[in-house]
Amino acid sequence: SMSKPAKTDITDIKRDDKTGAQTITWKVATNAASYNIYRAEGRYAEYKLIDTVKADQTSYTDTKPNTSSKYKNYYKVESVNGNVNGEMSEPYSLEIAQFGDNMYVFNDADDKDAISDKVNEIFGYQHYDQFGQNRYAFAFKPGDYTDTSADAYNVGYYTQILGLGKTPYDVRIKNVKTPAALANGNVTCNFWVDVENFTIAQTSDGSDYWNDSFKWAVSQAAPARRLNVERQTLLQWTWGDKAWASGGYISDTKFHDAVG
């Protein structure tokens, strides 16, 4: 039987500014007899097969990329050996090349649950990582991102969520929460988190205000700015004698409901 080919990695992307063509380059994969080239309109959009090349080729020029935006072209390469397919490469795009692995840029073509899964996966790494080295940013292009089964985007240390629209009305997000980094709901160490320039949409009837609220339970170095908040806002994580919070800087924000 055929050996399963190794996973490859896309290492480079270049765009021809005259023709718009985009050229990707990848690493040779052990046991690969050919490579399938896939393209999507976003990191978490639907990847479709656009071409297949032989194993002696480790670059591909897409002469007909999506032209609605040069940035709406994300690529994956799959190594193939006969009827045995290898694991897909990680996605690559002009945005990833420009901003690096720890900045995620989303657009309206992306699967909304996949976005939630990634944001909350990163939160799992960052929740208690007060002295860690990793930094993350999630940038949302104009669109509505509320159609997700996730309760909210949870954000921890060294994480930024930002809308890329001209106004906060251009990006609609379901909800954001900052779970306490210390015991007893104490958020006095919830530092170094930032949210800005989007709408927090009211998608529930608001009857369970404690769970439905925008929870900006933070300490210093945690700005929330230029938001349009349709939900009730809570500035603490939970009730209790030791459930301390120390504010959090909020500016240039419109609240449609109670804050406290």
Give the ranges of each region predicted by the language model.
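Recognizes extended acidic, P/S/T-rich segments that occur
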Residues: N36-S68
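Beta-strand-rich modules
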Residues: D62-N85
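N-terminal extracellular ligand-recognition/capping segment immediately after the signal peptide
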Residues: D101-Y104, D108-Q160, K166-T178
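Feature marks extracellular polysaccharide-active and adherence modules
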Residues: K141, L162-T167, K174, E196-A201, ...
